[in-house]
Amino acid sequence: MKRIGLITLIAAICLALGMMVNPTPVVAKTTFVTIGTGGITGVYYPTGGAIARIVNQKRKVYGIRCTVESTGGSVFNVNAVMSGDLEFGVVQSDRQYQAINGLAEWEEKGPQKDLRAVFTIHPEAITLVAADDAGIKTIADLKGKRVNIGNPGSGQRQNSIDALEVNGINYETDLVAEGVKAAEAPGLLQDGRIDAFFYTVGHPSGAIKEATAGRRKVHFVDIPNIDQLTKKFPYYAKAFVPIKFYEGATNKEDVETFGVKATLVTSAKVPDKVVYAVTKEVFDNYEEFKKLHPAYEVLTKENMLEGMSAPIHPGAMKYYKETGLDKYLK
């Protein structure tokens, strides 16, 4: 009995010592979040990458792992965020306005009441690129031409239609409208399969550089009657295409057009702590963020709070109130 008791005592001591020396590690649960962007040659994709890079630097602090997905663009991103397939999406400011108000693609579904704004990013110019040999000097010259206006469901498609209609051009009857993704248009233009294309994009853009660097010479076309557009649609503003980024274009001066802003949206169902972390890391590392793409050169903390139509997510609002940035919200 004594022998058995001694063995039991030794076993108990060993077990206790083992627990003290090798405690079971507590592993923090990682929350995976995905940002929906756009084509890989546009600015949305690197924008999502820039946000993810900043946030992932503190992944051990927040327990958040951020990834990026190339998507069909704004409309897809809104719908994917609303369905829970994405936690965040980069969306044109006009599409944010339309979604929260139940307009355009959301007319049948109605207002997307759970859509929430986080912040805005770079300005995006509605850019019209035409081949020099296609005889297109003005937007009126697009009549009878083969023009890519953007894939169905993309923000740029509606921008293209608005630009055409304000100038008296019906995209269904006055031209041969193609509906391919913006990233494919430069190749089609260089191959001679289209005469021109619209692209709503921040500058500089890899896709636009591709279009202007080919053997077929191209130029940018002014879009007139912008005052009528901005009066009718509150989310549009005057903009320009900066020629300095595109040495291959045959233009000599910047080109007038109109534009929107890229915005980051999420859902009301995404936890406050996740949205707070994303907001805090981007704004706390604002100077580093600005260096991640030339399109961010014009950013200020103040103008990153302009152009939002949906309610601000509580997680983002918490950060803005903590830092006093909420005074810039309109």
Give each language-model segment a name.
Residues 32-58, 120, 124-191, 306, ...:
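Bilobed "Venus flytrap"/periplasmic-binding protein-like clamshell domains
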Residues 15-25:
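C-terminal segment of classical bacterial N-terminal signal peptides
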Residues 145-162, 236-308:
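Ligand-binding clefts/hinges and TM-proximal coupling segments of bilobed small-molecule sensing domains
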